[in-house]
């Protein structure tokens, strides 16, 4: 039976799917593999460029900001379109190269006058929290106002890339709160994500996420900032502890239940030591 040739559109869809599911720290390896499979750089660049951008935004990819001692985060919350993003801390917009992971062509931008005092106060607290809890952590805080509603968004990213030891991992958390200045309470919503890929003598991925909801009393900028970070700290500590406990339980039960007398690889696994295979451990609070 004659096979129907794969169309360019289908090739782009498949390649884009590979790109979007690249494990943390392994974008370049996946890109090079699909480039070799496709053997058409023009089609790859023109057809899958949206996947490069989406991957970097989904992963909360950190980027170095010229002339500063901090990194910013690439995300959907600071996407200005046409490949440009902005850093609210330095109030600069920039062009971002999604393959080179570099910023260029900086321009000053004007902050949202209503949201900025709240954003700046929360940014200071977030910086201190990230520095004390995440060894290589990067954070960005975004603010915008619509009418009398202020929305603040916190993005936190940390990663450990250890290709020489055959594993890579990333922590991501995003938090949002919308409120009216100086009145009532507001709901703080968060999404926490951990992804680790371990590939020595096998191929194992840990992918975990959790949604959180908390209540915040709204009074002034400093009080809201401190209360939001207190709630974030409690929620993220609880989540990280739960992952560690779950992982230990899996080592003691699930992994042993999956054992075979001799795996398909024909190589025996020391199931009693599988908990030491590094998955998730390096993303715990330092």
UniProtKB/Swiss-Prot annotation:
What domain of life?
Answer: Eukaryota
- This protein's record includes keyword Cytoplasm: yes
Gene Ontology annotations for the cellular component aspect, listed alphabetically: apical plasma membrane; F-actin capping protein complex; WASH complex; Z disc
* GO biological processes: actin cytoskeleton organization; actin filament organization; barbed-end actin filament capping; germarium-derived oocyte fate determination; negative regulation of actin filament polymerization; negative regulation of filopodium assembly; negative regulation of JNK cascade; nuclear envelope budding
Q: Where is this gene product found?
A: Cytoplasm, Cytoskeleton
User: Where are the bilayer-spanning segments?
Assistant: none
Stored SUPFAM superfamilies: Subunits of heterodimeric actin filament capping protein Capz
For this protein, the record's Pfam families field holds:
F-actin_cap_A
Q: Which GO terms describe its molecular function?
A: actin binding; protein heterodimerization activity
- Identify the keywords attached in UniProt to this record, alphabetized: Actin capping, Actin-binding, Cytoplasm, Cytoskeleton
InterPro entries reported for this sequence = CapZ_alpha (IPR002189), CapZ_alpha/beta (IPR037282), CapZ_alpha/beta_2 (IPR042276), CapZ_alpha_1 (IPR042489), F-actin_cap_asu_CS (IPR017865)
According to its UniProt entry, the function of this protein is described as: F-actin-capping proteins bind in a Ca(2+)-independent manner to the fast growing ends of actin filaments (barbed end) thereby blocking the exchange of subunits at these ends. Unlike other capping proteins (such as gelsolin and severin), these proteins do not sever actin filaments.
Q: How does it assemble?
A: Component of the F-actin capping complex, composed of a heterodimer of an alpha and a beta subunit.
Family statement: Belongs to the F-actin-capping protein alpha subunit family.
Query: What name does the UniProt record give this protein?
Result: F-actin-capping protein subunit alpha
Q: Which organism is it from?
A: Drosophila melanogaster
